[in-house]
Design a protein with these regions (language model features):
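Residue-level preference for alpha-helix termini and adjacent loops
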Residues: 7, 15-16, 55, 64-66, ...
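The Walker A/P-loop phosphate-binding site
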Residues: 187-222
């Protein structure tokens, strides 16, 4: 399903199959996407039907731990669904394992806020939600909910979502898979700079009249 119908590259699906983050449901042959906590313990599972629009979070799942990949870099790429995440990796493969990628399982903020809390190394967040009004509205809301200190950008896919871009990859001969990149939706507060003056730059002058004559009990008003 993922490779034939969704056109996800085999090296990408194989990577997550080997980790146990994607598997096939034996009973219904659904694709199941697993989300883990920082210790690698499964805390979430989403079942996606290979035919029709069936999708379901497995009972007991914690949406704070959605399907993701944790890299050691400072960048986090955020998507609505696991298939969007996988599609993006196919389109932008170079060095992808260095950075982090997160599916929200929709447009809620729970997984994003938990991920940022667990990963203080993240400095820059790329919101890669669908290129439609719902995706734009969700991005605006997520930016407001995120803590201060992050740089946030918005990447809009050339088509409605990243899998649709992947489906048309052969037609996009110039390799430009973005409709638009909107930079600086949020920026860290700028630290106030204080000018340092070197003593060598200070013009000194001796003022004798201030000290003479000596007045032991009075004050001199200047």
């Amino acid at each position: 399903y993922l490779t034939a119908a969704r056109r996800i590259d085999e090296d990408v699906t194989g990577f997550f199959f080997a980790r146990g983050d994607i598997y096939e449901d034996a009973a219904h042959h659904n694709a199941v996407f697993v989300g883990r906590d920082e210790d690698g313990i499964p805390r979430y599972a989403h079942s996606k039907g290979t035919a029709g629009n069936f999708r379901l979070d497995v009972k007991g799942s914690d949406k704070a731990f959605n399907f993701c990949y944790r890299g050691e870099g400072e960048r986090l790429f955020v998507f609505e669904a696991p298939i969007d995440l996988l599609s993006f990796l196919c389109l932008f493969k170079k060095g992808w394992q260095k950075q982090s990628y997160l599916s929200l399982g929709g447009v809620g903020e729970k997984a994003l806020l938990r991920f940022l809390s667990d990963r203080p190394n993240i400095k820059t967040v790329y919101l890669c939600l669908d290129s439609d009004q719902a995706g734009n509205d969700a991005c605006s809301r997520l930016v407001k909910l995120m803590p201060e200190g992050y740089t946030v950008h918005r990447l809009l896919p050339l088509y409605k979502d990243w899998n649709e871009v992947l489906q048309h990859r052969a037609e996009i001969t110039d390799g430009k898979y973005l409709r638009e990149a909107i930079y600086g939706l949020k920026e860290p507060p700028q630290e106030e700079t204080v000018e340092i003056i070197r003593m060598s730059e200070v013009d000194t002058q001796t003022v004798e009249w201030l000290w003479e004559p000596y007045i032991p009990f009075g004050k001199v008003t200047i």
